[in-house]
Amino acid sequence: IAPSILLKDGKPFMVVGSPGAARIPATVVTLIVNAVDYGLDVEKTNSAPRFLCQRSDQFLSLEARFSTEAQDGMKKKGHQLQLFGDFDLFFGGAQIILVDSSGTMYGSADPRRGGTAMGY
């Protein structure tokens, strides 16, 4: 699943990958949803708060940057929350490239991990 290459009309639209063992699928899917479903730009896609819910966990793990309202809503639905730091490496360290309709590429290195997006 990592790296993943998404095509739009047969052309590259998004390239994404992250380390994180069992957490890789959740991280990659969250980033794809941020870009495809919510239309976020590459930096917002990569820096948005993350969560993880695994079948083996009794907790819904999430970054503390989720709003109090969102956290309260999750608790009301019966979730036990496990809060992590604002940009916690627990949720991966993704690298993303988004390609617009003109072919221009935009890269992002996850703020949770050291890195830089560069091109030429």
What are these regions (language model features)?
Residues 65-120:
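Cofactor-centric catalytic regions
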Residues 1-87:
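Proteins synthesized as precursors that undergo proteolytic processing into mature forms
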